[in-house]
Amino acid sequence: MLGESEVRDKCGIVGIYSQDKKTGVASQIYYALYALQHRGQESAGISTFNGNDILTHRGMGLVCDVFNPEKLEELKGNVGIGHVRYSTTGESRIENSQPFWSEFQGGKIAIAHNGDIINSMELREELEEEGHNFVSTTDSEVICHLLSREYDEKPNMIYSIKRVSEQLVGSYSLVVLLNQDLYVVRDPVGIKPLAFARKGSTQIVASETVAFDVIGAEHVRDVQPGEILHLNRGKSYWVANAPNTRRAHCMFEYVYFARPDSVIDGRNVYRVRLNIGEALYREHPANADVVVPVPDSSIPAAIGYSRASGIPYGEGLIKNRYVGRTFIMPTQEERETAVKLKMNPIRSELEGKRIVLIDDSIVRGTTSRALIDIIRDAGAEEIHLRIGCPPIKSPCYYGIAMATKKELIASTRNVEEIRRIIGVDSLGYLSIESLVECIGIKKGFLCTGCLDGDYPTPLPSDISEYEAMRSCSR
């Protein structure tokens, strides 16, 4: 992505239940979170039940920074949940890290959440009027308080989850820890991914299947939209929560967010991205000498474009993975410097050549010109930019912090205007129809709200107020 900081995903979640009470699950959760680190790098946390109480450790930074062997040893228990976070609502501070926990008359619950609750402000105000106290500014803590409130009234967690689901508008994949019981929830249209696996007597859920691979578990199935899974004493109970004929799987998981070695709702992400590259060539061929990806997420699409076109594939840009995110840079000049630090050209692959540059998406476009300048300074004769995601014209309200509508470069500009701003010789976006075909899930089962404004849930009554809140909390 040209300026990866332009888009941030909400989170990654993990839940593990071992039938063997002598088996500690904290280390397995740690490794699973490591595999999901790409979904969030601001904070990480793990909660386990040790037979008497829910233990939690959270911290700011990467998984490897937050946990060490001593901390993992303290988190005893055969059942637990984990979380990695990027902020889409709520500031980046320790109070907003997850898992969250809440106490009720019978004990304590802990939750980890991936998604975004559109009506969280209204729900929070309602809870505060009832006397609930909040320690964070996130929508995820609202869910935690709602569950504890419902459980106080009727101590049945399946019932409580169903009641809370009726109140939530937005996206949510949840893992809920209640003593030795683990509950797993996916929203009625399945916006965020969630999968289920087994390893012997251990059962695992996670945002992506790569979390299963690292701990040697076998992917069994996806948690279906509207399903509740209850894990207890080695058994799994699947409950239909909110049946819905519509599905709305996030298309951006396939385009950018998910790791290419994941399988999301039955679709191999790497294969989808290869398809995108092949389709880009069919829709937007170019006379060129080399196909170059913007690393890393665009590599499969570039390979696909190269195969379809017969134009050689080349690694023309090298990514420095130790540079901080460019969105923290206050001025455009500093952001452009950060791009130069993050992406360095291989002059021998670019000089005097006509380049097909493959990227997954353009959101604001604020750092795109800087990267194009880098490639031109390396001696590229022509640059033909091909984008695997159709123009992003509307914001995401479901857990991807990309931009407000006025910040989106494609919201008020056509392709030719964007081409001139970015400074490339030609620009081609994949069409929505081809993207749907590449993913292999029919359009009515994908969320394409950011592309065409067709959102799967009601939107906030005051969009401007909601977007202002989101902007201030990033």
Swiss-Prot record:
Family: In the C-terminal section; belongs to the purine/pyrimidine phosphoribosyltransferase family.
Co-factor(s): Mg(2+); [4Fe-4S] cluster
PROSITE patterns linked: GATASE_TYPE_2, PUR_PYR_PR_TRANSFER
NCBIfam families registered for this protein in UniProt: purF
Gene Ontology molecular function terms on file: 4 iron, 4 sulfur cluster binding; amidophosphoribosyltransferase activity; magnesium ion binding
Matches recorded under HAMAP family: PurF
Keyword Iron-sulfur among record annotations: yes
Pathway: Purine metabolism; IMP biosynthesis via de novo pathway; N(1)-(5-phospho-D-ribosyl)glycinamide from 5-phospho-alpha-D-ribose 1-diphosphate: step 1/2
Superkingdom of source: Archaea
Lineage: Archaea, Methanobacteriati, Methanobacteriota, Methanomada group, Methanobacteria
Organism of origin: Methanothermobacter thermautotrophicus (strain ATCC 29096 / DSM 1053 / JCM 10044 / NBRC 100330 / Delta H)
Binding residue positions for [4Fe-4S] cluster: C250, C396, C447, C450
Cofactor binding mode and count: Binds 1 Mg(2+) ion per subunit.
Annotated Mg(2+) binding sites: S297, D359, D360
Keywords: 4Fe-4S, Glutamine amidotransferase, Glycosyltransferase, Iron, Iron-sulfur, Magnesium, Metal-binding, Purine biosynthesis, Transferase
Active site: C11
Propiece residues: 1-10
Protein name: Amidophosphoribosyltransferase
Domain (Glutamine amidotransferase type-2) ranges: 11-234
Catalytic reaction(s) noted: 5-phospho-beta-D-ribosylamine + L-glutamate + diphosphate = 5-phospho-alpha-D-ribose 1-diphosphate + L-glutamine + H2O
